[in-house]
Amino acid sequence: NVPTAAPATKAPENVPTAAPATKEPTPAPVAHALDLSGASHIYMNDSGTITVNSDGTVSGSNIQGMLIPLDDTDLEVGDIVEITVHGSASDSIRGWISTDADNRASEITNPLNFGQTYSFEITGNANYIQLKKKSYNASDLSSINITKIEVKYLKNRVEKDPLPDGKKWVTTWGTAEEPVENQDGVKNFIPLAKTTVRQIIQVTTSGDKFKLRLSNQYGKSSVQVESMHIAKQGARADQSDIITSTDTVVTVDGKESFEIPAGEVIETDTIDFKVTALENVAISTYFGGNVPTTGVTGHRGARATTYQTPGNEVSTESLGSVNGLKTCTGWFFLADASVVMDDDARAVVCFGDSITDGYGTDAGYLGKKPDSYTRWGDYFAKRLQANESTKNVSVINEGIGGNAIFGGLGPAGKDRFRRDILEHDGVAYCIILFGVNDLDKLQNTSKFNQLKPEYEKMIALCHANNIKVYAAPILPFGKSGYYSEGSEGVRQLINNWFRSTESGVDGIIDFESAVADPDNPKNVREEYTHSDGLHPYDGYEAMANAIDLEMFEK
C-alpha cells in the first residue's frame, strides 16, 4: 500500500521563450506654449487692466505686474525649467517663478529680454510666472503685451519610494493653508519653539502606507522640527490620548530632525502606517528653537482640538496631565496626508468658505463642541464609505472661513484655487460652493460680471487637468446681514449661470434646495440656521445627503 510516485513529466522541447517586454522610453521634454487666459494682477489693489484677447494673447495697461499660471503642478526643488517670453513692454521688466504675488521662488532674470530663452533651477514652490517692472520703486507698467510664453520642464530628481504597478498615492485628508498667527483661538500657541504640538486629523480612506506634506508657505524663515511622530488617536476624539503601540517616527530624507524652508512645502518619507477610513490620526511635533512667529502657516478652523505642551512629549500617551497644557482648534504647518491606494482610487476637493469649513459645528452657545466631525464634508465622507462603489473616494476639505473670490479672510479664493485643487494627489473631482462673501450688501448686480470670469477660470483649470467640476449654487442668506436686493440678484445670476450649459460644469449639487425654507426660498430653514441666517449649522447633514453618489462612481 505504498503509493507510487507520479511519473515525472517531461518539459516540452523547442518551445521558444518569449522575449522580455521592453519598457517604453520616456519621451524627451519639449517646449510648449502656456495658456495665457489665466493671467491676473499680482496685487489685489491694482487698478490697471489686464485683457485676454480673442487670439489668445494677453495685454496689460497701467498695472503693477502680471501673474501667469504654470501648467505643471509637479515641479519640485531641483527641477530645471526653460522659459521664453514673447511680446513687448513699455519698460524693462523682470521675471520670477513664484508661489503667489508675495512669495517669489526663483528669479528668471533681471531684466528679462523678450524672445530669449532662460534656463534656471527651481528653488521653491512654483505656481506662476511673475512679470513686473524692473525697478522696485517705479510707477506702474504703462503697457505690456504677451503674445506667447514657451516652457520646457526638465525633471531633475529621482522619484522617492517608487510604488508597485497598480498602486498610487491619493490624498486622504487636507486643509487650506493661511497665515494664522493673529487669529483668535489660535494665536495663543505662538511661539511654537521648544513645544510639542499634537494635531488630530481624520482620514477619509484606508491605506497601509502614509505620507504628509508640510507647509511653510507664508513663513519668512525656516521651521525647525526636532521630532515628529504619528499614532492612532485613543478611544475618545476629544482627548489627547494616543495608542502608544502605533507610535511611529516620521522622517524627511531619512532624518528625524529636519527643517521646512521658508516659503516651501516639503514631503515626508513614506511611512509604514496602516489607517482605516474615518479613523483619527495624531501628529505630534516637537519644534526646535527656530520657528516663525509671523507668517505662521496653518488653518484656524480645524473644528478639532490641538494640544500644546512645553518640551518633547511626542510619544507621551496622554498630554492631559502635562503641566502647561494648552488647547486650540487650529492646525499648524499641515497641508495634507496621502495613502497608497489602488489605481482606480480618487479624491474629491470641497472648495469653499466657512460653510465648507464647518462654521458652527463647534458653536458653544448651541451646545456644540469641537471634535464632532459634522461638517458637510465629514458627512459626505461617511456616505462615500458606506457605499461599496465609492469606498475608494477620499474627501479633502479646502474651506476657509470668511474667504471670498476677491479677498476676504485668508488668501483670496481666486489666488489659492490652483494650489488647493492641483497640489493634492489623485484629485478627480471638485465641488465648488463659493462666493457668498463677495455678495455682502451689494447695491446692484454689476458684481456678477466680475465673478463670472473667475468661476470660468476655475472650471477651465479643472478641465485642463482632467478634473470634473460640480457646482453647488450659493445658499440663500435672506435673514443675514449680507442681504440686499443687489446681493440676491447676483446670487440668482450666479446660480442660474451655473445651471446653464454655458457654465460648462459637469453637474450640479443642489445644496440650495436642501437647506432653503420652502415657504421663503430666499432664507435658510430656521431650524438649520437659528438666528444666524447664513450658516446652516444643523443643515450640514442634509447638504451631504443631497449629493448623488453616482456622480462619484466610475
Locations of the language-model features?
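Catalytic His-Asp segment of secreted/periplasmic serine-dependent ester chemistry enzymes
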Residues: D440, L475-K554
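Extended extracellular/luminal ectodomain segments enriched in beta-structured repeat modules
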Residues: D74-E82, N125-Y128, T205-K211, D343-R346
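N-terminal secretory targeting modules
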Residues: P3-A8, P12, A18-H32, L154-F351, ...
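Extracellular carbohydrate recognition
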Residues: Y136-V151
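Short carbohydrate-recognition loop motifs
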Residues: G48-I63, P179-G185
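Extracellular ligand-binding interfaces
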Residues: G56, G60-D74, D79-N125
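Conserved SGNH/GDSL esterase-like catalytic core that processes O-acyl groups on lipids
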Residues: A231, G324-G330, L334-S338, A345-V349, ...
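Short beta-strand-plus-loop segments that form exposed binding edges in beta-rich domains
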Residues: L131-D140, S284-N290
